[in-house]
Curated annotation (Swiss-Prot):
Beta-D-mannose binds at residues 51-55, 59, 63-64, 170-174, 178, 182-185. Residues 26-131, 145-229 form the Bulb-type lectin domain. Keywords: Disulfide bond, Hemagglutinin, Lectin, Mannose-binding, Repeat, Secreted, Signal. It comes from Colocasia esculenta. The lineage of its organism: Eukaryota, Viridiplantae, Streptophyta, Embryophyta, Tracheophyta. The gene is TAR1. This is Mannose-specific lectin TAR1. Residues 1-23 form the signal peptide. Mannose-specific lectin. Shows agglutinating activity towards erythrocytes from rabbit.
Length: 229
């Protein structure tokens, strides 16, 4: 099954943001970005740490790179080919996920259920067994306030917040992106009642009203898989 990524601004707006302008997320790493020594990605009880002993450890997730004491001042980088790479301070490679794919935009996301997943073409994920979490039905994935995973739903006045941007599914049925230099909306103000936004397993964003009538869609349907907005 594909693990695909929808980038919020490029996917919805067709805008391009310089990589240098994109700050490191608290629970994700974009291609070209680096997690420095003692850096963290966090999501709920899960904490991915690039330790000062050069070991990459997912706490409460029962996973590690097994590279303790293999280098100093190590850094984790996600390449433009979807490969996670740990490098020593001299630039030598200590560990890599060996999941190299086609060149493109990727995101390594610390999933709410404790998986570290690279979204893009299907490339790399670890599947730790965490009692009480791995047994959850997919629809019960804990909500993350800056990411939407298929098939999660954003209800009226619900929002996704990333740095100075907010994507809001307003109570008036309009989907609006606030913040930054650019703004955007679905132009569906007043077109329905009790509307909600859903990301389906084909990567399509859909606004429906309380009668499940489709008010708006991104028309970006792709192959069946797991997606993240």
């Amino acid at each position: 099954m594909a693990k695909l990524l929808l980038f919020l601004l490029p996917a919805i707006l067709g805008l391009l943001i310089p990589r240098s302008a994109v700050a490191l997320g608290t629970n994700y790493l974009l291609s070209g970005q680096t997690l420095n020594t003692d850096g963290h990605l966090k999501n709920g009880d899960f904490d991915l740490v690039m330790q000062n002993d050069c070991n990459l450890v997912l706490y409460n997730g029962n996973w590690q790179s097994n590279t303790a004491n293999n280098g100093r001042d190590c850094k984790l980088t996600l390449t433009d080919y979807g490969d996670l790479v740990i490098k020593n301070r001299d630039g030598s490679t200590v560990w890599r996920s060996r999941a190299k794919s086609v060149k493109g935009n990727y995101a390594a996301v610390l999933h709410p259920d404790g998986r570290l997943v690279v979204f893009g073409p299907s490339v790399f994920k670890n599947d730790p067994w965490v009692p009480g979490l791995n047994s959850l039905a997919f629809r019960n994935i804990p909500f993350t306030d800056n990411l939407l995973f298929s098939p999660q739903v954003l209800y009226g006045d619900g929002r996704l917040t990333a740095k100075n941007h907010q994507l809001v599914m307003q109570g008036d049925c309009n989907l609006v992106l606030y913040g930054g230099k650019y703004g955007w909306q679905s132009n569906t103000h007043g077109n329905g009642e009790h509307c909600f936004l859903r990301l389906n397993h084909k990567g399509e964003l859909i606004i429906k009203d309380d009668d499940f009538k489709t008010i708006w869609s991104s028309s970006s349907s792709s192959k069946q898989g797991d997606y993240v907005l």
